[in-house]
Amino acid sequence: MSHLVKMENGQSQTIQEMLGCIERYNPDHLKTLEAYVQDQAKNNTYDLEANLAVLKLYQFNPHMLNIDITYTILLKSLTSLPHTDFVMAKCLLLPQQMKDENVQTIIDLADILERADFTLFWQRAEVNRNMFRHIAGFHDSIRKFVSHVVSTTFQTIRKDLLKELLGGIEDSTLESWIKRNGWKHQGQGLVVVAMQDDKIKTKNITEKIEFDNVGGLMAQCL
């Protein structure tokens, strides 16, 4: 869905155009931005800049705070891990937002993910499943982050452990994630995450430095 922002001169701008000018701080545009946040949740899209603009408007206009939109922005920022979007969003929260019980729950979930305690995360996620039921693709976005961590941590991993880390998924779903990440079955209940040839290899880099680039520096040393 396309969201247009109505300017005082009667013209319309896209949200991206509005965010590039001083109009991003105009509270008259807050309702449009909040609707845009809801569309991101519904359609599994993501716009960090717009979401941070909403939180900034809440800072300037605390009386306009919508706590449900705050939840959605924080949860959407979790779906972008391992990027630091959640930290940026958290830094813009008002004291009244930080005191909210659901906000604290989301912060706890973020801490658990950052510690890579995925088994605990899925347990807490199940208890609080109603909180992000409206976020399309939330679970798969977290599984994508889990896959990233697994790929950078393991060479081989037990199939049963991998299923647990991905949220206790079914075998058929596990197969799709194995295929998606380019992993391979090794037998004996093991999954190969990284082949020996995929290990980081050292590389010699030769840089040619011209005399003109260092002549001035050498002259100063004389």
Curated annotation (Swiss-Prot):
Domain of life: Eukaryota
Domain PCI: 46-208
Pfam families on file: CSN8_PSD8_EIF3K
Subunit structure: Component of the eukaryotic translation initiation factor 3 (eIF-3) complex. The eIF-3 complex interacts with pix.
Subcellular localization(s) per the UniProt record: Cytoplasm
PANTHER family: EUKARYOTIC TRANSLATION INITIATION FACTOR 3 SUBUNIT 11 (PTHR13022), EUKARYOTIC TRANSLATION INITIATION FACTOR 3 SUBUNIT K (PTHR13022:SF0)
Name of protein: Eukaryotic translation initiation factor 3 subunit K
HAMAP family in UniProt: eIF3k (MF_03010)
Origin organism lineage: Eukaryota, Metazoa, Ecdysozoa, Arthropoda, Hexapoda
A Gene Ontology molecular function term of the record: translation initiation factor activity
Stated role: Component of the eukaryotic translation initiation factor 3 (eIF-3) complex, which is involved in protein synthesis of a specialized repertoire of mRNAs and, together with other initiation factors, stimulates binding of mRNA and methionyl-tRNAi to the 40S ribosome. The eIF-3 complex specifically targets and initiates translation of a subset of mRNAs involved in cell proliferation.
